[in-house]
Regions:
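Flexible "cap/lid" subdomain of the alpha/beta-hydrolase fold that forms the substrate-access gate
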Residues: 2-31, 35-205
Length: 205
């Protein structure tokens, strides 16, 4: 879809209902990981009669933020944080990623570095910056990225990477980035939605 609004929660949840209708399925168990989990948590709030269960891997249900999430991201991480940058009406991040498709997947599809020997309990090192504000400036990271200087191990074979590169060379990144451009809209339009009355089970792993 060409419009930003086509990627908001109402449309994405509606797409899942449309898929179920196409498959003649009255109910489904939805399993989502990371950002996909956020979409699936919308289902029992927006379409409760179509939901047999929801599993969020890495994404528990969060209550509605007390303020516009874009402003919260900006306050905590600064203007260079990738989600904040994605709001740019000039769509500069789309251009950066779209003109460096192979670089983008070279950078993101790698294993993190192991913790230093003197700090065995430290979190893995992603290798893209020294601080949160630097780590999250993804457009600038990709613009300056050179795989020759990246010590991390790729997680994709050349054949697997080619699938991603060929696909995004054809489609561009705007559709995916439009997901982030709906954060404010989703927040504005989710007032009154509540999952706390439903049966939920949180399992930490």
């Amino acid at each position: 879809p060409g419009t930003v609004e086509a990627y908001d929660m109402e449309h994405l949840a509606g797409d899942l209902v449309g898929l179920m209708d196409h498959l003649a399925s009255d109910k489904a168990i939805f399993v989502g990981h990371d950002w996909g989990g956020f979409v699936f948590w919308q289902m029992p709030m927006r379409h409760p009669l179509r939901v047999a269960g929801v599993v969020g891997v890495n994404t528990p249900h969060w209550d509605r933020a007390p303020a516009d999430p874009i402003e919260l991201f900006r306050q905590r991480f600064g203007d260079k944080m990738y989600i904040v940058q994605f709001q740019d009406p000039a769509r500069e991040p789309d251009r950066i990623f779209g003109s460096r498709v192979e670089q983008t997947f070279d950078a993101f599809m790698r294993k993190p570095l192991a913790p230093p020997p003197d700090k065995p309990t430290a979190p893995p090192i992603a290798g893209v910056g020294a601080a949160a504000k630097t780590n999250l400036a993804f457009p600038q990271m990709i613009a300056a990225y050179d795989a020759k200087f990246d010590p991390r191990t790729p997680i994709l074979s050349a054949e697997e990477k080619k699938v991603f590169v060929d696909t995004f060379t054809m489609t561009g990144f705007t559709g995916g980035i439009n997901w982030y451009r709906n954060f404010t809209r989703n927040w504005q339009r989710s007032k009154g939605l509540d999952l706390r009355s439903k049966s939920t089970l949180g399992v930490r792993a």
